[in-house]
Amino acid sequence: MSKLFWAMLSFITRLPVPRRWSQGLDFEHYSRGIITFPLIGLLLGAISGLVFMVLQAWCGAPLAALFSVLVLALMTGEFHLDGLADTCDGVFSARSRDRMLEIMRDSRLGTHGGLALIFVVLAKILVLSELALRGEPILASLAAACAVSRGTAALLMYRHRYAREEGLGNVFIGKIDGRQTCVTLGLAAIFAAVLLLGMHGVAAMVVTMVAIFILGQLLKRTLGGQTGDTLGAAIELGELVFLLALL
């Protein structure tokens, strides 16, 4: 289990992980790592929250929020933000399904993707600033948001098909079963409840689950399935929805 955790941490983040800690794990077994997603999110959110706490006393909530969001993006290699931008460029192009998928593969940033990035990043900064002004525990809120967003991403993997012929998203999409999905969501719910002292965190998670489930169905109808980009988009939007639900 520990080897699986380190493999997933290396796979979906840019945090340094010694190679020997995950050696011997076959790539085809990576789908089992979905149950570690909430724990990895918890770690990422806690680090981002610590950045906020350290900087808030020095430069105030808005700048602390700016740098905490920046650190969170850097720790993930901006993969999720890139997925959000690519998904929006493709889906909002109003082209055929195949053309949408081609646009999503294009490394160039389009208008829709750029607007989505600006909106999500600014929204996170503003919501974190508002939560701080209301006296909410930012470290716990960020840790829970990152855990829940990565946990609810399982809703885009279970009983979904991969929309492309090949790609990294194919490691998880359509490869996890109901038990793994329930365990992943259960862990995310436990983290949210413990960190935010009960039903407040669970209620925010329920809102996030509903939003991500609807997003998954819309993307399935539009693209014919999911991709690594749509998983990244779901994680970014899941973080934002969870934080908004805490207001």
Swiss-Prot record:
Keywords: Cell inner membrane, Cell membrane, Cobalamin biosynthesis, Magnesium, Membrane, Transferase, Transmembrane, Transmembrane helix. It is found in: Cell inner membrane. It is a multi-pass membrane protein. It catalyses: alpha-ribazole + adenosylcob(III)inamide-GDP = adenosylcob(III)alamin + GMP + H(+); alpha-ribazole 5'-phosphate + adenosylcob(III)inamide-GDP = adenosylcob(III)alamin 5'-phosphate + GMP + H(+). Its cofactor is Mg(2+). InterPro entries: CobS. Pathway: Cofactor biosynthesis; adenosylcobalamin biosynthesis; adenosylcobalamin from cob(II)yrinate a,c-diamide: step 7/7. GO terms for cellular component: plasma membrane. The keyword Metal-binding does not apply. The chain crosses the membrane at residues 34-54, 57-77, 113-133, 138-158, 194-214. GO terms for molecular function: adenosylcobinamide-GDP ribazoletransferase activity; cobalamin 5'-phosphate synthase activity. Its EC number is 2.7.8.26. The keyword Transferase applies. GO terms for biological process: cobalamin biosynthetic process. It is an enzyme of class 2 (transferase). Joins adenosylcobinamide-GDP and alpha-ribazole to generate adenosylcobalamin (Ado-cobalamin). Also synthesizes adenosylcobalamin 5'-phosphate from adenosylcobinamide-GDP and alpha-ribazole 5'-phosphate. Belongs to the CobS family. PANTHER family: ADENOSYLCOBINAMIDE-GDP RIBAZOLETRANSFERASE. This is Adenosylcobinamide-GDP ribazoletransferase.
